[in-house]
C-alpha cells in the first residue's frame, strides 16, 4: 500500500475531474495505520510524552514478551526478522524495552492521526467545491484493528481478539440524521447488503466471504 501523501493528491485530482458527474463512487484506501508504520519523517508526533498505563505493559509483562519468538513478537517486529527500512526510518526492527514498545504504539497512533488528517483534506475539498451535499454518502471503515502488545504480539492483526476485531465504522448517509452512535455488535460483512438496501438496488442471498 502507498502512503497517504501519495494517495490523497490522486484522490483530489480524481474529484476535480469527476466530482461534478452524477452517481459516482470513489473507493480510497489508506495504508498508514498498517505496519511498517510510515508517517513522513517531518510529521510531528502528537503522542510523545504520554506514558503507557501502569496496568498495561508492565516491566514484568514486557520481560516475558522478550522471551517470545515468531511473527511480530518484540524481537521480530517485521514478521520473520528484525530488519529496518531506510525508507521508513521511524519503524523499528525490534523492541528492546517498554520505551521502545511505547514508541511503536505512538507510531500506530500517528498513522491513525495522519490518515485522519488526509481524510479531512478530502472532506474539506468536497465541502469547498459544493460536493458535500444532501446526496453524498460517506463511509469510513477498516478491515481490521491492530494488536499492540496483546498476547505479546506487536503491530499485527493475525488473531481474532478484541483489538483486531474492533474497527471504525462511520457512515454519513443522505436522509439519515447525524450524531447517532450504535453500540451493539455489528459485522462488516453486513456492509455491502446494507448499502444495497439503502440504495434500493437488488440484494442477493448468496454472498460468499
Task: Give names to the regions the model predicted.
Residues 1-209:
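Catalytic domains that recognize anionic headgroups
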Amino acid at each position: 500500500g502507498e502512503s497517504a501523501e501519495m494517495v490523497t493528491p490522486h484522490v483530489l485530482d480524481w474529484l476535480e475531474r469527476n466530482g461534478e458527474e452524477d452517481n459516482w463512487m470513489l473507493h480510497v484506501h489508506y495504508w498508514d495505520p498498517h505496519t511498517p508504520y510510515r508517517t513522513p519523517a517531518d510529521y510531528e508526533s502528537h503522542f510523545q510524552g504520554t506514558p503507557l498505563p501502569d496496568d498495561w505493559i508492565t516491566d514484568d509483562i514486557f520481560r516475558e514478551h522478550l522471551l517470545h519468538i515468531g511473527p511480530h513478537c518484540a524481537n521480530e517486529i517485521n514478521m520473520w526478522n528484525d530488519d529496518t527500512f531506510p525508507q521508513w526510518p521511524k519503524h523499528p526492527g525490534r523492541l528492546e524495552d517498554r520505551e521502545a514498545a511505547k514508541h511503536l504504539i505512538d507510531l500506530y497512533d500517528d498513522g491513525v492521526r495522519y490518515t485522519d488528517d488526509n481524510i479531512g483534506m478530502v472532506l474539506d475539498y468536497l465541502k469547498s467545491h459544493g460536493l458535500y451535499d444532501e446526496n453524498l454518502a460517506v463511509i469510513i471503515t477498516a478491515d481490521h484493528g491492530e494488536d499492540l502488545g496483546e498476547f505479546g504480539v506487536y503491530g499485527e492483526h493475525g488473531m481474532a481478539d478484541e483489538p483486531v476485531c474492533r474497527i471504525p465504522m462511520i457512515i454519513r448517509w443522505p436522509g439519515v440524521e447525524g450524531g447517532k452512535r450504535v453500540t451493539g455488535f455489528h459485522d462488516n460483512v453486513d456492509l455491502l447488503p446494507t448499502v444495497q438496501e439503502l440504495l434500493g438496488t437488488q440484494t442477493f442471498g448468496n454472498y460468499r466471504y
